[in-house]
Amino acid sequence: MGTDAYVLAGIVITPVALKYLRAKNFTGNPFFYAIYSKRLQTYCGLASYLRIKPQIGTIEVGWITYAPNLQRTVEATEAMYLMMKNAFEGLGYRRYEWKCDNLNKRSKKSALRLGFKYEGLFRQATIYKKRNRDTAWFSVIDKEWKKLKKSYQRFLKSSNFDKNYEQFKKL
């Protein structure tokens, strides 16, 4: 890593990557968010909305990149909750999507844990790193949001966590 790279709590962002992110945010698709930890007092991750299609009411969450100190924390879950809440309640979308490489077991597990429903597999959907990539599709739709939101709110209550931020009840 050169001296011109930015390190965000373990996430390396080079000037080229920063230029790319800035250019993408000016178009609004994808639209990136920085994830800040109040507990750690630092930025720990990135996530974005992409494939934003207001004309048909669909939006995807992706480019999710967490530093090790954000992974598997209540803050990581809360960040995903806030983005989902904004997609449905703030922006008025009817469908919220999550897609990932079918080989990415952690991403698929995260999608299911966060309340997304598995929809299927697009075989050879793209070419990635000189190989065919099968893409797993997940979604939450507006009719499911009210119930899912209640689950998130119960999970995120401070009474659900001990002093070390370990949860008592799962999402």
Q: What does each of the following model-derived ranges do?
A:
Residues 98-107:
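Conserved beta-strand-loop-alpha-helix junction that forms the acyl-donor binding cleft
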Residues 83:
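Flexible ATP-lid and adjacent glycine-rich G1/G2 motifs of the Bergerat
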Residues 117-131:
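Conserved catalytic-core motifs of GNAT/GCN5-like acyltransferases
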Residues 89-99:
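Conserved GNAT acetyl-CoA-binding A-motif
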Residues 110-111:
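Hydrophobic residues within well-ordered alpha-helices
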